[in-house]
Amino acid sequence: MGENYALELRDISKSFGSVQANDHVDLTLRKSEILAILGENGSGKTTLMNMIYGIYYPDEGHIFVNGKEVTIRSPKDSYELGIGMVHQHFKLVDVLTAAENIVLGLPGKRKLDMKRITEDIQKLADKYGFELNLSQKIYEMSVSQKQTVEIIKMLYRGARILILDEPTAVLTPQESDRLFDILRNMRKDGCSIMIITHKLQEVLALSDRVAILRKGKYIDTVETAQANAQSLSEMMVGGRVDLNIDRPEPENVKKRLVVKGLNCKNKEEVKTLDDVDLTVNAGEILGIAGISGSGQKEFLEAIAGLQAIESGSITLLDDNGKGTELAGMDSISINKAGISLAFVPEDRIGMGLVGDMDMTDNMMLRSYRNGKSPFLDRKGPKALALKIKEQLEVMTPSISAPVRQMSGGNVQKVLVGREIAQNPKVLLVAFPTRGVDVNTSHVIYRLLNEQKKKGVAVVCVIEDLDVVRELCDRIAVFCGGKISGIEDGRTATKEEIGLLMTKHEKGGTQA
C-alpha cells in the first residue's frame, strides 16, 4: 500500500442478481489529486462510488483509507473516515437556509450556537473561494449555489476525500470555471477528489489522472497530461470512436411550428414561461439552452400537451402551410387527433417508459395512449423492440427484461427509438444525452440528424454547450422563462451563450 494514497480499492466486486456491476476492480486515489472516473453507461462507476460512500457493501475486496483497511457499511461510516459525496441530485431541505442545511443532522447539542457556526462555515467558504449567502433559503438559490451548499456541507463535516457525480451537468461555462478553481484550491489544501463525468474536455482540463472502467472491469489509470479525448474514448469502449458531430446543412426548410405569446404558470402560480415567441423549422435541429429551471422543460411540455397554458398559441403547420392549433390540447387529445408529434421527456423512467415493463410492453404504450384496445397483437411491438435492440445496440439480457434493469444510456436508446418509429413531423427531446456515455451520445446525435434529413422539425434541450454548438442549426437561449437570444449554431461561442443564460443579453434574431 503506497503511503501517499488517500484511498485504495483492491479486488472489489459487486453483483446484483446475475448482473456483475463491478468485477475485481483495483483503484487508487493519491493524496492531493483530482482523479476522474470514466466509463460507458453500465461500466460500474456509480456502483463503485456508492461502495466507497457506504450506500452499497462489496461482495468481495478490500478498501483502504490513508493506508488502513476499513469497513464502510453506511454513509455514517464514510463521514467518520473523512469521505463525502455530492450526488447529481442534491439532498437539501428547500425551506431551510444554507447554514441550517450544512449543520442538519450533525450530532451534538439540541440547541446550536448558529452565530458561531455560521462564522465557522463562512471562514471555510472563504478559505476555498466559495461565494455563498449562508442566510439564503435553498429554494431561492440557483443550481450552482445549491451545489456549493452540498460541497461545503461535506467539508464542514470533515471530508478530505470528496466524490462528485456529474458536477457540471447543469452549470453554465462560467459556473463550471468557478467550480474548477475551487476544486484546485481544495487540492492545494490537501483534499483528494474523485469526479464522475462524461465530458472529456473537462477531464483533460481539471484532472491529474484518469481511471477507466469498462463493463464492470478496471482497464487502466493514466496520467491526464499523457492522454487526449480520442485515447480516453477508445479505452472506454474498447475500440475506435469518431468524436466528430455531424451537422448536415438544412434542406427544404419551411416553418413547421409557430409559437406566439406563450405564457405558463406552475402549481404555485409562478410564471415559468413569459411571452415566448419562437418558430421551429422542418429540416433543422433547434437547440434550447439555459440554466436549469429557466423554462426549457416547460416549453417542450407545453407543446406536447403536458403543461397547462395560460395564454398564447402553438400552431403546427403542414406542408401546405395549413395550421392546427395545439394550445389547449392535452397529450391524449393530440394523439387521438393523429397529430404527428413525438416527445422524449427528461424523466425517462416515469414519464417516458414504465420501469417494471419490458421493451415490448413499452412499445405498446403508444397504442394505449392512442385509445386503442389494450388487447393488442404483440407481434408488431415485439418486432419494433427487437429492431431497436439490434439497430441501436441496446445492452439488455432480453427484450423481456424490465427496462429498469438497463443503464441510463440504454433506456434512452429505447425511448428515442420508440418515438422516432412513429415517423413524427415534430420531435421534442429533453436532455438527450444527460448522463449518457460518449459512444451512446453519438448514437443519439446520429438518430437526431437522420430525423433532420427526413424533414422533421427537431427541438432539443441540451445542457452541454459544446454539443449544442456542434449539433444544432439555431440555438434559442432561455433565461427566467424568456428567450434572451437566438444564435446561429455555426458562429455562436460558449461565452456568448453563457452570458445570454445569465441575462447579460447580446442581440440575437430569429432568422
Can you name each region flagged by the protein language model?
Residues 2-511:
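Glycine-rich phosphate-binding loops of nucleotide-dependent enzymes
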